[in-house]
Design a protein with these regions (language model features):
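Glycan-processing catalytic domains of CAZymes
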Residues: 1-183
Length: 183
């Protein structure tokens, strides 16, 4: 019952807002999991079919019409760029991802033993490469920039002392906006 009430609240308060992301005329709703609702039957009671996008590999828990979005992953010896490219080009309507790198901060931050893997920033090349993957994946519904300002995980796009405006200027180049760093 709470999930239904939460969905109704978000739908009534945010979906009609012109600033809310729409994909193919529908509000885009991402679920980092799912964690609480884990079957298509549970999701069918909460959200209209096709409205929910689960993190990659979890869409079956939401239902056959669920969308998917890619996320930062580099564990198990996975080539993260190849994984993002394969996901982004496998089926239309998916949401791709670009991120600057990843730092396994969990043990240092006091959250267990950590993940045991990291993705190098390579002076901005990781982010640029993933933007290139998105540019060559014409059937993506959207591109998510992960995560904007997660300084612990090193996935920040916001300017820093270490990287300056590297990621923002790369994003400006990618989107083709008419302004640059001076503005």
């Amino acid at each position: 019952a709470q999930a239904k009430a939460d969905w109704a609240h978000v739908a009534n308060r945010h979906f009609a807002d012109t600033a809310y992301l729409q994909v193919a005329g529908e509000p885009w709703v991402g679920v980092f999991g799912p964690i609480e609702l884990e079957t298509p039957a549970e999701w069918a009671e909460v959200a209209p079919a096709g409205r929910v996008h689960a993190i990659w590999g979890e869409a079956a828990e939401v239902g056959p019409e669920a969308g998917e979005f890619a996320w930062v992953w580099g564990g198990g010896g996975v080539d993260h760029v190849a994984a993002v490219a394969a996901f982004s080009q496998a089926a239309p309507g998916r949401t791709g991802v670009a991120y600057p790198g990843f730092k396994d901060y969990y043990a240092q931050g006091g959250w267990g033993d950590g993940l045991g893997w990291e993705i190098a920033h390579d002076a901005g090349q990781t982010f640029s490469t993933l933007l290139d993957v998105a540019a060559t994946s014409p059937d993506l519904a959207a591109l998510q920039i992960a995560t904007w300002n997660d300084f612990g995980e090193g996935t920040m796009v916001e300017p820093t002392h270490e990287f300056g405006f590297t990621y923002l200027t790369a994003l400006q180049d990618f989107t083709g906006v008419a302004y640059g760093l001076p503005e």
